[in-house]
Amino acid sequence: MMTFHPSPPQLTLIKSMLFIAALLPFGRLALFTLTDQLGANPIEFITRNTGDWTLYFLCMTLAITPLRRLSQWNWLIRLRRMLGLFAFFYACLHFTTFLWFDHFFDVNEMLKDVVKRPFITVGFSAFVLLIPLAITSTNGMVKRLGGKRWQWLHRLVYVIAALGILHYWWMKAGKHDFEQPIIFGTIVAVLLLVRVFWAWQKRSKNNALAGTSDCRTG
């Protein structure tokens, strides 16, 4: 595959364009709200839209490492933090919609709903787990936690994605409409299996090298 190594100004431009593109769904939602184009059920439209974009950005975040390894475009890793933070941004909008329109900012009533309805329990759990990932996304937090601990913490993103998809599946179950949850689930499963395969491949290689070294020293 053709290698592409952007210069610092080019990378800044790419990041700026990605930032603007990532805000477009929010801009569209704001425009539809202001022009009364949210349809017959505005609350449902906003809730579904922000939930969908949370999952889109989670999938894009998870796709960065496989894309980087397959394309050898190491600079792609510089985009992962932004994509992850936009996943958190749309998750915050999704949660705010639930807290505002469903419970009018009554936290006690919201928590009762979280306990009572399993699909909300799952979605709320995913949102809560996203918070420490967003907080520790800075370079300073990477240094403070240490590389290994930071990596272990951020592997929670797969748990979060799985919980988000389960939340979506459960929500769609009432209408027997599983097409989109299946698509999201397949994407996340493939991305996870690719990483598992690479980890197994690396371990096998290390074991083979260790065996060769033992034979030589023996």
UniProtKB/Swiss-Prot annotation:
It is found in: Cell inner membrane. InterPro entries: Fe3_Rdtase_TM_dom, MsrQ-like. It is a multi-pass membrane protein. Pfam families: Ferric_reduct. The keyword Transport applies. Part of the MsrPQ system that repairs oxidized periplasmic proteins containing methionine sulfoxide residues (Met-O), using respiratory chain electrons. Thus protects these proteins from oxidative-stress damage caused by reactive species of oxygen and chlorine generated by the host defense mechanisms. MsrPQ is essential for the maintenance of envelope integrity under bleach stress, rescuing a wide series of structurally unrelated periplasmic proteins from methionine oxidation. Belongs to the MsrQ family. This is Protein-methionine-sulfoxide reductase heme-binding subunit MsrQ. The lineage of its organism: Bacteria, Pseudomonadati, Pseudomonadota, Betaproteobacteria, Burkholderiales. The gene is msrQ.
